[in-house]
Amino acid sequence: MATRATHKRWLKVSALVIGFFGPVLTLATMPATDELARLGLDILTWPVDGFPTYASDEMRFLSALTGGFLVGWAVTVWLLSTLVHDAAPEAVRHAVVYGACAWFVVDSVGSITSGQWPNAIWNIGVLLMVVGPMWRPAED
């Protein structure tokens, strides 16, 4: 079983997993640096067929918003690990696990209702990487 120290370390893994996508999406706001995000979204909306594109200003704007939210969420999780976890480890675990589950449900439902169901399957892997051993309370 996982210990509090394991959970605290895993919070940093969670922050890095969440935060990775933020700069990628923010870079997609500029035509010269949008290919990684475009390819990533193409893979998430399987099959790889050139959809979606970053041709519209709306897509670039939504990438800016999403990138910012993801970086902010990642910084929050990192700071929960470094500033709060020692004082309230179970509360931090709950906050991150429930937050990740809320993201999973809303993002997956939105993906399915918009016809992009493959993303809901990818979301399972992301959820498992974010939550990791924090599904259960620490044993110490």
Descriptions of predicted regions:
Residues 43-44, 125-136:
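Alpha-helical transmembrane segments and their membrane-interface exit regions
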Residues 28, 54-60, 77-91:
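Short juxtamembrane and helix-loop transition motifs at transmembrane-helix boundaries
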Residues 62-80:
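Alpha-helical transmembrane segments of helical membrane proteins, especially in multi-pass transport
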Residues 11-18, 67, 97-100, 104, ...:
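Residues within membrane-spanning alpha-helices of integral membrane proteins
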Residues 3-11, 55-62, 89-96, 115, ...:
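Membrane-interface helix-boundary signature
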Residues 1-27:
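Cytosolic juxtamembrane helix and N-cap/initiation of the first transmembrane helix
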Residues 20-61:
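Membrane-helix boundary elements
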Residues 105-122:
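Membrane-helix boundary connector in multi-pass membrane proteins
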